[in-house]
Amino acid sequence: MTTRKTNRRALLSGAAVAMAGAAVSTSTAKAADAAPLKKVYRTGPKPATPPAYSTGISFGNLLFLSGVVCRTPGDIKVHTEFALGEIKKQLEAAGSSMEKVLRCTVFLADMKDFAAMNEVYTGKFGDDPPTRSTLAASGIPANSLVEIDVIAYI
């Protein structure tokens, strides 16, 4: 009788180990077949050589957009409107929107432009705007008066 119980336990124990191993193998295979968590978004065709940075990258359902500047002449209102318009286009191309922005960082060439930038900025993100930091920064590319980057969800 003891031998039968021992054999039965050994059989059940072996079956449990085999099932656990199969479950791990299956979940590992599914993870390998799953879509990658990281996806790169570009505003143009893929460059022939690796660029210095990516315009946008999503990881899971989070989307990170690089800073957007204005390369044309104009005052802070023109530059802010342009940057926010480009951000809106990039968000929508990635399946997001201004209302889904969680975090925004604004870099101003001159903090004296804060009030004028805010006039254009306010209301662009819907009724519940994202968290934001605004900093003075020298050397913004292309002589832009503002650079804005965002983190959103898709």
Question: For each of these PLM feature ranges, what is it?
Answer:
Residues T2-F82, E92, A109-I154:
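N-terminal presequence-like segments and the immediate start of the first folded domain
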Residues L62, V101-R103:
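Intrinsic-disorder/low-complexity, polar/charged segments enriched in Ser/Thr/Lys/Arg/Asp/Glu/Gln
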